[in-house]
């Protein structure tokens, strides 16, 4: 039968819709020959109802819905969940190309934090970290980052309050995608920038570039920068973070000072405590000297074991003594005991392997 010319043609568009702003969706909708008000409907179904397929949008005309089935939204598939005794859930998510990434949902009272990945694998090869043992495969696109938050929010049936870019990958090596994702998470999904933390081992020039960005979308940059320091001196840092051998710790700290001056935001320093390596009293003194006069905060993270390396977690007494030594030097410090140990979802343990502790999908 000959077509009348009135039936909608099947729409194909390889670029997922997730991550697009309302004006961008308006342009897309009008290009499909639809009235611009459909964009607001699409926007609401993408970001408030977390749809996986455009055919789910019941307010669209049936014929047009059917023509849109091939248009990718940009959602992943949960292939596995593993749960720690604290209630933290690690998710293995299958992407459109079959690759697997990890995201973690971390409950705390009435709040829900999502730890997101920014890359598939990681090129930094930090000696204590499981992710780096598998090498780097590719960057994640903005929609693949945004999807992790929507997936956890949908699974928990609870609004996400905080996001930490501390999953797989080095966020500042994928900065454009990370900033695009943060713009959407903040302005389209409604998660405050002050509830978002971006972590980095420190890439030469990238912290300054981040500071000079100044804005995310049409809003001032207000998220927290967390720098994975992990050592009080260059020798220990070179051992733990091979990439730091070409980036002196003094240069890193100067770039962090510039960041504070430009943005007015303090820097958080992450410091994983490893028994017998960087947890001694004299090393607490060295760390305090490094950070003297710095607008910063230190998160001490007792090491979370992985199979591939021999590092050990210090005793609680040693952790407390290290923290007290910093406080005596007027360094703001918090001890972060990880909640995801039972699910291999703690800091340094993410590697996109299936866990034996799972819930049904």
UniProtKB/Swiss-Prot annotation:
Molecular function GO terms recorded: 4 iron, 4 sulfur cluster binding; metal ion binding; rRNA (adenine(2503)-C2-)-methyltransferase activity; rRNA binding; tRNA (adenine(37)-C2)-methyltransferase activity; tRNA binding
InterPro entries: Aldolase_TIM, Methyltransferase_A, RlmN_N, RNA_MTrfase_RlmN, rRNA_lsu_MTrfase_RlmN/Cfr, rSAM
Record-listed E.C. numbers: 2.1.1.192
Record carries keyword Methyltransferase: yes
Residue intervals of the Radical SAM core domain: 108-344
Binding site for [4Fe-4S] cluster: 122, 126, 129
Cofactor(s) recorded in Swiss-Prot or TrEMBL: [4Fe-4S] cluster
Major location (coarse): cytoplasm
Gene Ontology CC terms: cytoplasm
Annotated active site: 102 (proton acceptor), 347 (s-methylcysteine intermediate)
Biological process, per Gene Ontology: rRNA base methylation; tRNA methylation
Coiled-coil residues: none
Signal peptide stretch: none
A family per Pfam: RlmN_N
Residues at which S-adenosyl-L-methionine binds: 169-170, 199, 228-230, 304
Catalytic reactions of this protein: adenosine(2503) in 23S rRNA + 2 reduced [2Fe-2S]-[ferredoxin] + 2 S-adenosyl-L-methionine = 2-methyladenosine(2503) in 23S rRNA + 5'-deoxyadenosine + L-methionine + 2 oxidized [2Fe-2S]-[ferredoxin] + S-adenosyl-L-homocysteine; adenosine(37) in tRNA + 2 reduced [2Fe-2S]-[ferredoxin] + 2 S-adenosyl-L-methionine = 2-methyladenosine(37) in tRNA + 5'-deoxyadenosine + L-methionine + 2 oxidized [2Fe-2S]-[ferredoxin] + S-adenosyl-L-homocysteine
Cofactor note text: Binds 1 [4Fe-4S] cluster. The cluster is coordinated with 3 cysteines and an exchangeable S-adenosyl-L-methionine.
Disulfides per UniProt: 115-347
Compartment(s) where it occurs, according to its Swiss-Prot or TrEMBL record: Cytoplasm
Enzyme class: transferase
Swiss-Prot/TrEMBL keywords: 4Fe-4S, Cytoplasm, Disulfide bond, Iron, Iron-sulfur, Metal-binding, Methyltransferase, rRNA processing, S-adenosyl-L-methionine, Transferase, tRNA processing
Matches recorded under CDD domains: Radical_SAM
Further facts: Reaction proceeds by a ping-pong mechanism involving intermediate methylation of a conserved cysteine residue.
Function (record text): Specifically methylates position 2 of adenine 2503 in 23S rRNA and position 2 of adenine 37 in tRNAs.
Family named by the database record: Belongs to the radical SAM superfamily. RlmN family.
Name of the protein in its database record: Probable dual-specificity RNA methyltransferase RlmN
Organism from which the protein derives: Synechococcus elongatus (strain ATCC 33912 / PCC 7942 / FACHB-805) (Anacystis nidulans R2)
